[in-house]
Amino acid sequence: MALIRLVAPGRVFSDLASMVAYPNFQVQDKITLLGSAGGDFTFTTTASVVDNGTVFAVPGGYLLRKFVGPAYSSWFSNWTGIVTFMSAPNRHLVVDTVLQATSVLNIKSNSTLEFTDTGRILPDAAVARQVLNIIGSAPSVFVPLAADAAAGSKVITVAAGALSAVKGTYLYLRSNGLCDGGPNTYGVKISQIRKVVGVSTSGGVTSIRLDKALHYNYYLSDAAEVGIPTMVENVTLVSPYINEFGYDDLNRFFTIGISANFAADLHIQDGVIIGNKRPGASDIEGRSAIKFNNCVDSTVKGTCFYNIGWYGVEVLGCSEDTEVHDIHAMDVRHAISLNWQSTADGDKWGEPIEFLGVNCEAYNTTQAGFDTHDIGKRVKFVRCVSYDSADDGFQARTNGVEYLNCRAYRAAMDGFASNTGVAFPIYRECLAYDNVRSGFNCSYGGGYVYDCEAHGSQDGVRINGGRVKGGRYTRNSRSHIFVTKDVAETAQTSLEIDGVRMRYDGTGRAAYFHGTMGIDPTLVSMSNNDMTGHGLFWALLSGYTVQPTPPRMSRNLLDDTGIRGVATLVAGKATVNARVRGNFGSVANSFKWVSEVKLTRLTFPSSAGALTVTSVAQNQDVPTPNPDLNSFVIRSSNTADVSQVAWEVYL
């Protein structure tokens, strides 16, 4: 009679070495390893990938760890085993130990990597390389479009059978057309990643419906083509911690902390990434803490960066819908950099589109706190702050960047700046404090400055066109608004200055017009501005060889007293002491101007005539003229007029 084992024997081991050396495991065995890295195992003779954490090779077969939920780094005997475990998709690993990286850790689709308070990854001691990779790949085969696809379209066409696209497939479109987000494309060509939502074929042509509209025109004349990339999808990194302060005197170099390429739905939160740069030193090896290249729907939240050679978060290629929230970057080149790819080693495609930075902070950056490098579209920063940057606080080098309620403190150059050829950044409710050159510099291509404040700079706003509306400016040593061009070939455009509070506070002029750079004041309009206290000296001019025509002026205030009242005409005339002012000379670097006096008749006697202002006179007392003794005459066309007339003085 055959004997049948009814109860599997229990095999308990106190250490890993004795367990993996045991020679007599059988399939039914119940196997237990004691200790912090212990657990329950099953034995199998089926070939399995060994990672020395969840799968061990033993005599005659393999031990498989029994677990539900994440694996733990403390289970693994070495870094190579962790790399092996994470090389497959659908993985969840908790880093609960200090790991010494000896190679790149590649993370695949549908995976999560999270760190406990004691979990760390220390960069490779021997080779400077990336630490964590979420890397897909570009298509290996492209097919041409069957027809032009216009910007705004959500449909492309290819020849029937040319592309094996089905619902859910990612597509990578590109052409030889150049990116258009900024003034200098550096030769980078257009590209986008889209997802297929439907496919239909008729008459030898396959129509592919896309999840989002195209941002560019894809023309056959520009060799527009499409392929299927390999995307890494749905990856989450929770509290990633790379390197340590003072670890081996910060000599553990890495090129990129977390590198993503052709990835979708990548989310990084609450991390710490420490670079190798000595405090305050210039750029060194170690480009970026986090790099997104050709990624879609990515987020970074609550992550800190220290001593990074270049960038905290770098976004380039056709990355789209990237959001960065609540990061803190200390002693990096830029906290956030939207970048172009170098074409020195061949063609490159794609610019960042739809980028949003919210509640981000940059401290002591070696260059601008936040930068957009020449290309990119629909870029926005909200409630971000730059402190003590060695260049500008914020630098816009692509068109139409929008800043909402951001702040710049003590930048070595401008608090907020654009660059050559950049058109019309938008600033709303932003604050600039104690920046060396200016609070806002829009003098490279114009800009819009709405309800902002600048205090303690040489100039509050440098600008050559656009609009400055609302806001408050104080303690700016030369001027509150400097109308100039930082580059001679930049075209001056019309400029509206409206409703700005720029009272005299002991330093600087309200406005400065830079004739040296060819500024034409007639392209400027100034209205409803509070320039109280500046008096005759509200404007500074330089570089003009003949007296220029002043800007268009309306309802500006130079004083807060002696500027309104009521006069009663006697025999059709009244002399009024008021703070009327004017400059009647013809000196080149000055404007010829006189106060505007608005008259409103309050009574209407039968003798009422047409009212005019004549004989504006300024007190000439020496050494200090008294503006309260300035005067003007209200005169009626009817010498019998005895009307009461309200008067208001403006510039």
Swiss-Prot record:
Principal localization reads virion
**For site (Important for catalysis), what residue positions does UniProt give?**
Y311, H373, R397
Give GO cellular component annotations, separated by semicolons: virus tail
The entry's localization annotation reads: Virion
Coiled coil stretches, renumbered: none
The protein's site described by Substrate binding 2 and important for the adsorption and infectivity of phage is found at R472
One matching Pfam family is: K1-lyase_C
- Marked site, Substrate binding 1, at Q130, K291, E314, N339, W340, H373
Reported EC number(s) for this entry are 4.-.-.-
- Per the UniProt record, the site (Substrate binding 2) maps to N217, R378
The protein's UniProt keywords, in alphabetical order, are: Degradation of host capsule during virus entry, Degradation of host cell envelope components during virus entry, Host-virus interaction, Lyase, Viral attachment to host adhesion receptor, Viral attachment to host cell, Viral tail protein, Virion, Virus entry into host cell
Signal sequence segment: none
* Keyword DNA damage included in the entry's annotation: no
Per the record, the domain of life is: Viruses
A Gene Ontology molecular-function term?
lyase activity
The record's annotation in InterPro entries points to: K1-lyase_C (IPR056204), Pectin_lyas_fold (IPR012334), Pectin_lyase_fold/virulence (IPR011050)
Return the annotated region ranges for Interaction with the host trisaccharides on the capsule. Answer: 71-559
Kindly list the biological process annotations in GO that this record carries. adhesion receptor-mediated virion attachment to host cell; symbiont entry into host cell via disruption of host cell envelope; symbiont entry into host cell via disruption of host cell glycocalyx
Q: How does it assemble?
A: Homotrimer.
For this chain, the family text in UniProt reads: Belongs to the K1-specific depolymerase family.
Which purpose does this protein serve, as stated in its record? Functions as a receptor binding protein (RBP) and mediates the attachment to the host capsular exopolysaccharides. Displays a lyase activity that specifically degrades the K1-type polysaccharides of Klebsiella pneumoniae capsule.
Q: What is this protein called?
A: Depolymerase, capsule K1-specific
Source organism per UniProt: Klebsiella phage KpV71 (Bacteriophage KpV71)
